A protein has these predicted regions:
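Acidic, metal/ion-coordinating pockets
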Residues: 49-334, 358-372, 382, 413, ...
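Cationic, low-complexity basic patches in intrinsically disordered or flexible, solvent-exposed regions
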Residues: 29
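Non-catalytic terminal accessory segments
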Residues: 6-7, 14-18, 23-24, 33-39, ...
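Hydrophobic membrane-targeting signal helices
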Residues: 41-45
């Protein structure tokens, strides 16, 4: 973490390891006072403290957002076609809240998933995002499950450059610790003390490529919270859990751990107009991608901070805009467009998206993408529709432009469970499609083999064992298919679905970066008789 100003241009310079295994970043040190306070608090036993009492007149505003996913520019909300977000608008709205009453302390918290989901995030590995969040005054962020998608070393650099701490009390790394804190106590002169404990979803270890989580372990969050909360609670006015676990785990946490005043959540991309109450603990979440800003106000009553109001502030065309940040975003976007010609890998042969191939039969391109998805999610099976492959990737040097032309739809991976019966139904639908129509719904697969005979499914196996209709299989697919696209209504019955936040295009970029030269081929996983 860097408390010193660093220019965005400097921060976006190439980041290369040097001979001794360290990185070529400048040496920076110095920690805000409230972080040192935090470290002392976690070390002291709970019995040494008595609960702090706020003073009459004390007030506080908490602002929060989550699941930013690199969305620097405004976007169209698919739910209502409204233009939302844009970090220049988000920053100006935060500043507007602060200006309403300069004497009232405002704490800004980010509930995780800074990375993964836009061209600029992929190209610049999150550096513009972390720098601009610092400029808008984020006080603390929880580590999301996508913070390791570009590798541990990238996350370490981002943490060093950030003007705010990343938190996660339940994530550990061996042998080298990750640059995260368990918690912070935010203390400002004359203001209530706010303890913030960070918790990350256990899905961290399955939602990114296995190489990104080498040496990483995730402890059960309820046990961690029970262990650490008493010391934080005893000398603060408000205890906040900054969670990137999703609403189900947040509910379980609220019901299982006493002493929590508020849970600020993320991971589901849910939008709650009012807090969800569990055991009188409010749980809040503010959608995704900076489209909304949550605001909770507190006032001291009878020695305790009491919630007085909650609102979701829309970030849209009616919002103010920070002109300096808007100009910075425009420059970053232009830089990204220039970067599209950058080479990310090498292809030994063309990956063809010819309709007469990828929509009719097994294709090397389909195998490559489906295998990547199954590998990084540890799924049993991967399913992708041939219509999702929009352009071929030529042999030779592979550029970012060629990958984005092949996958322009911004589809993301969805991981869930499907019964064997429904998996077979999906394969039956694919088999029944007339190949002469070049059907976009024809399935490219990984982890299984299926045989088509006279427009019918003649067999389907996983590891030479027939698919068991009663068994549950872990399946990864696109959000398009998971929503029943191309007539695959049976995939809507997927249980425990997780929107991974990982775009197919980003996955393919990472695949070329790490596996080049790529020599995809067919292996008779799909056969027609």
């Amino acid at each position: 973490m860097s408390p010193h100003p660093v220019s965005l241009a400097d921060a976006m310079t190439p980041y290369l390891p040097v001979a001794d295994g360290t990185a070529n970043r400048p040496s920076q040190s110095g920690w805000p006072v409230f972080l040192w306070i935090c470290l002392v608090f976690v070390a002291l036993p709970a019995a040494a403290f008595g609960r702090a009492a706020c003073e009459a007149g004390d007030a506080l505003t908490l602002l929060h957002f989550n699941d930013f996913h690199g969305q620097l520019e405004p976007y169209e909300d698919p739910r209502d076609a409204v233009e939302r977000g844009g970090i220049a608008r988000l920053a100006a709205t935060v500043a507007e809240v602060r200006a309403q009453d300069p004497s009232r302390p405002v704490v800004l918290l980010f509930a995780g998933d800074l990375l993964q989901g836009t061209l600029t995030s992929s190209l610049f590995l999150g550096v513009p995002d972390v720098m601009l969040l610092g400029r808008m005054g984020v006080d603390a962020a929880v580590m999301g499950n996508h913070e390791l998608d570009y590798g541990q070393e990238v996350f370490r650099r981002l943490s060093e450059e950030a003007a705010f701490p990343f938190l996660s009390a339940n994530v550990a790394s061996d042998p080298e610790p990750l640059p995260v804190l368990a918690s912070v106590v935010i203390e400002r002169p004359g203001a209530p003390k706010v303890a913030v404990l960070g918790l990350t979803t256990p899905e961290l270890t399955t939602a990114t490529h296995p190489r990104n989580i080498e040496g990483i372990s995730v402890e059960e969050p309820v046990a961690v919270a029970r262990r650490l909360l008493p010391a934080l609670r005893d000398k603060t006015d408000l205890v906040v859990v900054l969670s990137h676990m999703g609403i189900a785990d947040d509910r379980r946490l609220a019901a299982s751990v006493p002493g929590i005043d508020l849970i600020i959540g993320g991971h589901n991309h849910d939008l709650y107009a009012q807090p969800v109450l569990v055991e009188n603990v409010p749980i809040v979440q503010a959608g995704e991608r900076g489209g909304w800003l949550g605001r909770m106000d507190f006032q001291c009553r009878d020695g305790y901070l009491a919630q007085t109001d909650y609102a979701l502030i829309p970030i849209d065309t009616a919002s103010p805009e920070d002109p300096e940040i808007a100009e910075e975003v425009r420059r970053i976007t232009l830089d990204a467009e220039r970067e599209l010609g950058r080479e990310v890998g090498f292809n030994t042969r063309e990956l063809s998206a010819l309709r007469e191939l990828i929509r009719r039969e097994e294709a090397p391109f389909g195998n490559f993408v489906a295998d990547l998805a199954r590998e990084i999610t540890l799924a049993d099976v991967a399913l992708f529709n041939g219509g999702g492959f929009r352009a071929s990737i030529p042999a030779g040097a592979v550029t970012l432009k060629s990958i984005y032309q092949a996958f322009p739809f911004r589809n993301e991976l969805v991981l869930g469970e499907l019964t064997g019966a429904r998996l077979l139904a999906a394969l039956e639908r694919s088999a029944a499609l007339n190949p002469l129509d070049n059907p976009g719904g024809f399935l490219q697969v990984s982890g299984l083999r299926y045989i088509i005979e006279d427009g019918q499914l003649a067999g389907a196996t996983i590891g030479d064992i027939p698919i068991d209709p009663t068994r549950r299989y872990r399946v990864v697919t696109s959000d398009f298919l998971a929503a029943g696209g191309d007539g695959y209504d049976m995939l809507k019955a997927m249980t425990k679905p997780v929107m991974t936040g990982r775009l197919i295009s980003d996955m393919v970029i990472e695949g070329f970066r790490t596996e080049s030269p790529v020599s995809a081929a067919i292996d008779r996983r799909i056969m027609r008789r």
